């Protein structure tokens, strides 16, 4: 039995293409892997605090007493990391906003990236500590950006996930959604076909 963690990060709730596709992924996964456990965390409905000068102090090893706000941030960081490490498959629904990921997803990464916990520095360079996992990124875009200079989502997520130890990463693209109903329907159809292929593996 596998454990699947789904991270939603769109601010558009039910209107979101990435949310709809991640819901489709969950439906298909449950149909093919009924014994698996699926956890869904909506980072827009339950937002993560923005990292600032006070909160960053909670995430660094120190003997200094923590403020109540820092204690809350550290507890949330511990919770998010424990959840991440406890799951085998990580599904990230990542819409493109202004060429990059949403603020909601970036805030999550800022609390998950902790030296000595999810990665460490060694004499040979950084080493990821979140290993043995697979990641599937479902990314929706209004325009066509794949393999072009305006796609900052794909390299960023590949780099971040690899940095913490998740190197088995597959991407599902839904592009051209803003180009009209016909193009949007094709984007959804192509993305669902890619999801079907991944689920069937």
UniProtKB/Swiss-Prot annotation:
Species assigned in the record: Escherichia coli O6:K15:H31 (strain 536 / UPEC)
Molecular functions per Gene Ontology: electron transfer activity; FMN binding; oxidoreductase activity, acting on NAD(P)H as acceptor; oxidoreductase activity, acting on NAD(P)H, quinone or similar compound as acceptor
General function of this protein: Quinone reductase that provides resistance to thiol-specific stress caused by electrophilic quinones.
Residues that, per the record, bind FMN: 10, 16-18, 96-99, 140-143
InterPro entries on file: Flavodoxin_fold (IPR003680), Flavoprotein-like_sf (IPR029039), FMN-dep_NADH:Q_OxRdtase_AzoR1 (IPR050104), NADH:quinone_OxRdtase_FMN_depd (IPR023048)
CC cofactor note: Binds 1 FMN per subunit.
Top-rank EC class of the record's enzyme: oxidoreductase
Catalytic activity: 2 a quinone + NADH + H(+) = 2 a 1,4-benzosemiquinone + NAD(+); N,N-dimethyl-1,4-phenylenediamine + anthranilate + 2 NAD(+) = 2-(4-dimethylaminophenyl)diazenylbenzoate + 2 NADH + 2 H(+)
Protein EC: 1.6.5.-, 1.7.1.17
Family designation: Belongs to the azoreductase type 1 family.
Protein name: FMN-dependent NADH:quinone oxidoreductase
Subunit structure: Homodimer.
Gene3D superfamilies (alphabetical): 3.40.50.360
Reported cofactor(s): FMN
Top-level taxon: Bacteria
The entry's keywords: Flavoprotein, FMN, NAD, Oxidoreductase
UniProt entry tagged with the keyword Transferase: no
